[in-house]
């Protein structure tokens, strides 16, 4: 947390049919519906999250991600980072408090990769859902579906990875946890973190700007991932790959699609990092094993289906 950016806070997704998407994210993934607003957006959270929402669904003509938000320490930090983003050369816009329900003012910026991100300092604190703050039980007993624990990260496809790396490391205080490099030393994927997590956001080199690969949610155990696979089959949900293990981050994972075609991941495990750790490097000739550790073969759909 070198620059005051603490953690991923929310993601706003575009969906083609709001009620179908809500059934998916609420009843299958197990997120909790927290609110709706006058624009028709739906606000959800995972049970262990302390702020009011982490996922916002907006009905639109095309699927994809509108923006991903990160929480900063306080309003002074937000003001300082807005200035540094401008100095870096980013397109910056201030979104007033309340535009997202019960969220403070936000500073939105366009990364060189073509994705919109935003920073905010304040959001209504609702505490963990379904358990008390004093003498809490282990977990709520009436969770649905996969019982997602938290919104964990997003993976983006876009160009200008080096400039995006410089923005996230120099201005926002992320560090490089893991990477894939070509023979000539060019980095073609970068996994960036703010904490001891394997990553909080990741970028893959792609010819088009602003493409969205997946939104990821954390589960506690491998048995939970297998149970998620059962639920995917029970509900005839479109599956992408898994259950399997990544070489990158070593997370145990399964990927599937929401009704609009946005890719979701649920996973458990994964690597950890401390400040004295060096980045983990994979070479491009081992990309199959890096992505799918067991099969060691690239899956064309996984690599090319984007929103």
UniProtKB/Swiss-Prot annotation:
GO molecular function, one term: ferrous iron binding
UniProt GO BP: toluene catabolic process
VOC domain segment(s): 7-122, 150-269
Coiled coil: none
Necessary cofactors: Fe(2+)
Alphabetical list of PROSITE patterns matching this protein: EXTRADIOL_DIOXYGENAS, VOC
Reaction catalysis annotation: catechol + O2 = (2Z,4E)-2-hydroxy-6-oxohexa-2,4-dienoate + H(+)
Pathway membership, UniProt: Xenobiotic degradation; toluene degradation
Keyword terms: Aromatic hydrocarbons catabolism, Dioxygenase, Iron, Metal-binding, Oxidoreductase, Plasmid, Repeat
Record-listed Fe cation binding positions: 153, 214, 265
InterPro entries in the record: Catechol_2-3_dOase (IPR017624), Glyas_Bleomycin-R_OHBP_Dase (IPR029068), Glyas_Fos-R_dOase_dom (IPR004360), VOC (IPR037523), Xdiol_ring_cleave_dOase_1/2 (IPR000486), XylE-like_N (IPR054560)
Tagged with keyword Lipid metabolism: no
Name under which the protein is recorded: Metapyrocatechase
